[in-house]
UniProtKB/Swiss-Prot annotation:
Record-linked Gene3D superfamilies: Putative methyltransferase TM0872, insert domain, Vaccinia Virus protein VP39
Binding site for S-adenosyl-L-methionine: 41-43, 59, 86, 104, 111
Keywords: Cytoplasm, Methyltransferase, rRNA processing, S-adenosyl-L-methionine, Transferase
Chief location bin: cytoplasm
Catalytic reaction(s) noted: cytidine(1402) in 16S rRNA + S-adenosyl-L-methionine = N(4)-methylcytidine(1402) in 16S rRNA + S-adenosyl-L-homocysteine + H(+)
Underlying gene: rsmH
Native source species: Neorickettsia sennetsu (strain ATCC VR-367 / Miyayama)
Top enzyme class: transferase
One of the protein's GO biological processes: rRNA base methylation
EC number(s) recorded for this UniProt protein: 2.1.1.199
Classification of source organism: Bacteria, Pseudomonadati, Pseudomonadota, Alphaproteobacteria, Rickettsiales
Xref: NCBIfam families: 16S rRNA (cytosine(1402)-N(4))-methyltransferase RsmH
HAMAP family reported for this sequence: 16SrRNA_methyltr_H
The name this protein goes by in its record: Ribosomal RNA small subunit methyltransferase H
Length: 296
């Protein structure tokens, strides 16, 4: 999930691959759609603006409700916000059958910019990383209380980081001297494990990704939630998924391929990626990948 802009732009932001998503969703008058990862509401607003339809907006982050209220004022009685995790999409929506669902995965730039959420090493903040702040497990708990072996496993499995063991060892050594409580302190510990030279991405990137994915059970939620979502589609309706790293995309690819030809038709034989113009305008979109499947 990638978002650009400041406070005003957050409300009016353009999501990655928006025109492609709308093309595949093909919203119709009277249709019912689901934005399973509402965020700042870019997809919800675009769908509502395209035709006279209804959109269920789901997000586990209660703080995004302020963005929904703006959209609700613009499109009264045409949308409903549900504060919940899309892993529970079946129970959140009940027996509703829908005309299309969009998933825009990962953490948004909007969330990354809020220092006290602890998602980014670019902003000094507490080691939190919870998308749903009503849950208990934080990144601070993981790095200060989990075993070295467990920390290494998390970093390797969810960050695909080859230096995972060295990083875990450095974390455990550092916490013996002082509790690790901030994003900057963790980032410095991770960076100390790498030779001092230029890197295309910050050496701390994969470790922060791994902790965030683990704490929020992002991959487990994706597989379960997406599988349930497919059962909610009407014939001729589509699920559009935008992912931002290989772990997410692998789950989507394998699930879509497993149901292709068995009541579903895979519409994207190859992944859809942003155009050069979009990447130039929004560099954080460069890793986005879209896959689409249709109920037949």
């Amino acid at each position: 999930m990638s978002v650009t802009g400041g406070s005003k732009d957050e409300i009016l932001h353009k999501p990655v691959l928006l025109s492609e998503a709308l093309k595949f969703l093909a919203p119709k008058n009277g249709g019912v759609y689901v934005d399973a990862t509402f965020g700042a509401g870019g997809y919800t607003r675009a769908i509502l603006s395209s035709v006279d339809c209804f959109v269920y907006a789901i997000d586990r982050d209660e703080t995004v409700r302020r963005f929904f209220q703006v959209i609700e004022n613009d499109f009264p009685k045409r949308t409903n916000f549900i504060n919940g995790n899309f892993v529970d999409i079946g129970s959140l929506l009940g027996e509703v059958k829908v005309d299309g669902i969009v998933f825009d995965l990962g953490v948004s730039t909007m969330q990354l910019k809020v220092a006290d959420r602890g998602f980014s090493f670019l902003h000094e903040g507490p080691l939190d990383m919870r998308m749903d702040r009503s849950t208990l497990l934080t990144a601070e708990t993981v790095v200060n209380s989990y075993t070295e072996v467990k920390i290494a496993s998390i970093i390797y499995q969810f960050g695909e980081e080859r230096m995972s063991r060295k990083i875990a060892h450095a974390i455990v050594n550092a916490r013996r001297k002082k509790r690790i409580t901030t994003t900057s302190s963790l980032a410095e510990i991770v960076r100390s494990c790498f030779p001092k030279r230029y890197y295309k991405i910050d050496p701390a990137t994969k470790t922060f990704q791994a902790l965030r994915i683990f704490i929020n059970d992002e991959l487990g939620a994706l597989e379960c939630g997406l599988r349930t979502a497919l059962t909610m589609l009407k014939v001729g309706s589509r699920a559009v998924v935008v992912s931002f790293h290989s772990l997410e995309d692998r789950i989507v690819k394998h699930l879509f391929r497993s149901v292709h030809g068995n009541g579903f038709n895979l519409l994207t034989k190859k992944i859809v990626v942003p155009s050069r113009d979009e990447v130039r305008e929004n560099p954080s979109s460069r890793s986005a990948r879209m896959r689409v499947i249709e109920k037949v």
